[in-house]
UniProtKB/Swiss-Prot annotation:
UniProt source species: Streptococcus pneumoniae serotype 19F (strain G54)
GO BP annotations, alphabetical order: selenocysteine biosynthetic process; seryl-tRNA aminoacylation
Keyword presence, Magnesium: no
Main location: cytoplasm
SUPFAM superfamilies: Class II aaRS and biotin synthetases (SSF55681), tRNA-binding arm (SSF46589)
Keyword annotations from UniProtKB, A to Z: Aminoacyl-tRNA synthetase, ATP-binding, Cytoplasm, Ligase, Nucleotide-binding, Protein biosynthesis
One GO CC annotation: cytoplasm
Recorded family membership: Belongs to the class-II aminoacyl-tRNA synthetase family. Type-1 seryl-tRNA synthetase subfamily.
Name of the protein in its database record: Serine--tRNA ligase
Xref: Pfam families: Seryl_tRNA_N, tRNA-synt_2b
Keyword Endoplasmic reticulum: no
Length: 424
């Protein structure tokens, strides 16, 4: 959530920044007018209350003097009626301002490339060289079916489109991947957490999914509960409405969880395979940091995600997202895109973002600065470390052999009971 004080004091700069995220200037101008009206009403209310207090004191004095107070009582009643009417108007204005501040996206950092969409993203670096095959590489969905480890047909029968069963060494591979990821993040100082997979609406508001993106989630009807779209939600809200000790920052959390997404608006996109599912496993990284340290922590988090891909020897690139392509809560985002041979393309496998104090303001997560004793909003960061299903897809395609088998990456073999190859 944006700081209304920053919008007031630096309106032109904020408007210019948000314009790069597709926010119409008319929206901010309307918000500015409503905010000015609110402040004028507050002044009127305070003036009327002061007058009412004066009249009240005059009534008390008149009664002590046994004087007639009818006119003064009538005047006080009129003042009270005016205050009540203005308070009602103020409540309506506050609701409107809240609607603005909770649905406007975060302000992009100065270092973020300016652009309307993915076409303006900037590649930062690449790692690894895509393998040259001496045969036509298969898509991971065909490999998975031929190996008998991925079953979309029965997933569709049991549930519907974009669901599947992992079987045998496919299930073992999925489990090996996320255990490997959690172990690697643990070495980097992350505390492993098992979170609730259902959260309440306040938690969804805290991280920015609600109210703007309700259509992308699976709500439990007639309840206050939602299936989590990412472990970012419960991990970040772990400290909601709390004041942390500054000397304990930064704090690192990691968790593996299922993620549930309706994929509204994704009709026709990635209809086959593991790239876009309604339910998938993901290992998440979340950080709580002091403002002056958060961008250094973003670089470290991105490196933590890269470490997984490097140890799996999967070629990838790091991309800085443009202002128009970033997520709602982010001030800066790096995407990691892994090489998918059958698509001859890099595909997203991780997003690492700094939200600065955007989520912390919504969730009221603060810290007491040990330097001056003041309570301040901290910065929150989140990143995929990594999307597990997409990692399965990348391994199947990059490690496939001409006979249809798939070699298991060396880093995963201790997690696979010593298995080295998945054979038809």
């Amino acid at each position: 959530m944006l700081d209304i004080k920053r919008i007031r004091t630096d309106f032109e700069a904020v408007a210019e920044k948000l314009a790069t995220r597709g926010v119409d200037a008319a929206v901010l101008n309307e918000m500015k007018e409503i905010d000015a009206k609110r402040r004028n009403i507050l002044i009127k209310v305070e003036t009327l209350k002061a007058e009412r207090n004066t009249v009240s004191a005059e009534i008390a004095q008149a009664k002590r003097n046994k004087e007639n107070t009818d006119d003064k009582i009538a005047a006080m009643q009129n003042l009270s009626a005016e205050v009540k009417a203005l308070d009602a108007e103020l409540a309506e204005i506050d609701a409107k301002l809240t609607e603005f501040t909770t649905t406007l996206p975060n302000i992009p950092a100065d270092s973020v490339p300016v652009g309307a969409d993915x076409x303006x993203n900037v590649e930062v670096r690449r790692w690894g060289t895509p393998r040259e095959f001496d045969f036509e590489p298969k898509a991971h969905w065909d490999l998975g079916e031929d190996l008998g480890i991925l079953d979309w047909e029965r997933g569709g029968k049991v549930t519907g489109a974009r669901f599947l069963f992992y079987k045998g060494l496919g299930a073992r591979l999925e489990r090996a991947i996320y255990n490997f990821m959690l172990d690697e993040h643990g070495k980097e100082g992350y505390t492993e957490v098992i979170t609730p997979y259902i959260v309440n609406h306040d938690s969804m508001f805290g991280t920015g999914q609600y109210p703007k993106f309700k259509e992308d989630t699976f709500e439990l009807s007639d309840t206050n509960f939602v299936l989590i779209p990412t472990a970012e939600v419960p991990l970040t809200n772990y400290y909601r409405d709390e004041i942390l000790d500054g000397k304990d920052l930064p704090i690192y959390f990691t968790a593996m969880s299922p993620s549930f997404r309706s994929e509204a608006g994704s009709a026709g996109r990635d209809t086959r395979g593991l790239i876009r599912l309604h339910q998938f496993h993901k290992v998440e990284m979340v950080k709580f940091a002091k403002p002056e340290e958060s961008y250094e922590e973003l670089e470290k988090m991105t490196a933590n995600a890269e470490n997984i891909l490097q140890k799996l020897n999967l070629p990838y690139r790091v991309v800085a997202l443009s202002t128009g392509d970033m997520g709602f809560s982010a001030t800066k985002t790096y995407d990691l895109e892994v090489w998918i041979p059958a698509q001859n393309n890099y595909r997203e496998i991780s997003s690492c973002s700094n939200t600065e104090d955007f989520q912390a303001r919504r969730a009221q997560i603060r810290y007491r600065d040990e330097a001056d004793g003041k309570v301040k909003l901290l910065h929150t960061l989140n990143g995929s470390g990594l999307a597990v299903g997409r990692t399965v897809a990348a391994i199947l395609e990059n490690y496939q052999n001409e006979d249809g088998s798939v070699t298991i990456p060396e880093a995963l073999r201790p997690y696979m009971g010593g298995a080295e190859v998945i054979k038809p």
